[in-house]
């Protein structure tokens, strides 16, 4: 059976950078190029495609342009710390290095990297191609299905938790993948600045979804709820539905490439070595020279 690897570029680049941030200070002190994220992410991605047999490979990134979510909710992701300049300058080089490694690198104004991953995963699933998604973003868990697995990166790609159709409920509070966005609508998500419904914490949110399944069904059974819960939920349905919508990953956006053009390509060895050499990543120059 054919397999595709889909990587959340921003997520892994952040992990790569902050896992090795001490090297940034060393680079500053010695007037060297910032290269810690390039080196670490390239190693992550290389190890993933060497450890598994994939026929397709995509890494998606966010763009600087506002997304449709920003237009709906001005506060979306407003509390996130700005990306360090020392990482920003490495992103174009990371993208180029990944192309040399054989990946299709993609991005699309108006959408997040998640939406590209969701839409490509949907295309692969329709052709019964197994998909492995790698990210540290729990939003990706909503994409799990019979053909799609999500590897949640805890410490880069060295420590990961695999979510699939069989183990999902045991790992995610007894809920199903489609309920991830329902959970975020009720409980919120601090990382995206989604407040959820005031007074509804994780425990109560899980209980409600285990019993009623969706936000809509909770409100269908509103009169059967205890008085205290009714007070918390009263007139909050549209807020919860909005947050749930914002958390939902698009799976149907128009893509610039069809899946026939997303196959993993042979490594462009000399071009990759030149990029690594120019950015003083000597350990990887040696590594890829031996391939």
From Swiss-Prot:
Signal peptide: none annotated. Gene3D superfamilies: 5' to 3' exonuclease, C-terminal subdomain (1.10.150.20), 5'-nuclease (3.40.50.1010). The keyword Hydrolase applies. It holds the Pfam family 5_3_exonuc_N. Keywords: DNA-binding, Exonuclease, Hydrolase, Nuclease. GO terms for molecular function: 5'-3' exonuclease activity; 5'-flap endonuclease activity; DNA binding. InterPro entries: 5-3_exonucl_a-hlix_arch_N, 5-3_exonuclease, 5-3_exonuclease_C_sf, DNA_polI_H3TH, FEN, HhH2, PIN-like_dom_sf. SMART domains: 53EXOc, HhH2. Residues 176-269 form the 5'-3' exonuclease domain. GO terms for biological process: DNA replication, Okazaki fragment processing. CDD domains: H3TH_53EXO (cd09898), PIN_53EXO (cd09859). Its EC number is 3.1.11.-. 5'-3' exonuclease acting preferentially on double-stranded DNA. This is 5'-3' exonuclease. It comes from Mycoplasma genitalium (strain ATCC 33530 / DSM 19775 / NCTC 10195 / G37).
């Amino acid at each position: 059976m054919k397999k595709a690897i889909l990587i959340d570029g921003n997520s892994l680049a952040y992990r790569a950078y902050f896992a090795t941030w001490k090297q940034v200070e060393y680079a500053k002190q010695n007037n060297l190029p910032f290269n810690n994220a390039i080196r670490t992410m390239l190693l992550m991605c290389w190890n993933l495609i060497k450890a598994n047999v994939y026929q397709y490979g995509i890494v998606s990134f966010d763009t600087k342009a506002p997304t449709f979510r920003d237009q709906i909710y001005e506060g979306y992701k407003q509390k996130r710390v700005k990306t360090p300049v020392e990482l920003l300058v490495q992103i174009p080089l990371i993208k180029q290095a990944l192309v040399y490694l054989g990946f299709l690198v993609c991005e699309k104004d108006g959408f997040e990297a998640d939406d590209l991953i969701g839409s490509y995963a949907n295309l692969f699933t329709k052709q019964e191609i197994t998909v492995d998604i790698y990210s540290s973003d729990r939003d990706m868990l909503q994409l799990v299905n019979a053909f799609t697995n999500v590897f949640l990166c805890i410490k880069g790609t060295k420590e990961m938790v695999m979510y699939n159709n069989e183990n999902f409920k045991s790992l995610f509070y007894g809920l199903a993948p489609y309920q991830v966005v329902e959970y975020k609508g009720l409980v919120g998500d601090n990382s995206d600045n989604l407040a959820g419904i005031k007074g509804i914490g994780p425990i109560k949110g899980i209980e409600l979804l285990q019993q009623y399944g969706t936000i809509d069904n909770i409100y269908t059974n509103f009169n059967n709820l205890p008085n205290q819960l009714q007070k918390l939920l009263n007139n909050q349905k549209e807020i919860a539905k909005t947050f749930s919508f914002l958390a939902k990953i698009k799976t149907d956006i128009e893509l610039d490439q069809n899946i026939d053009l997303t196959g993993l390509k042979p490594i462009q060895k000399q071009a990759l070595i030149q990029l690594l050499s120019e950015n003083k990543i000597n350990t990887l120059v040696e590594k890829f020279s031996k391939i």
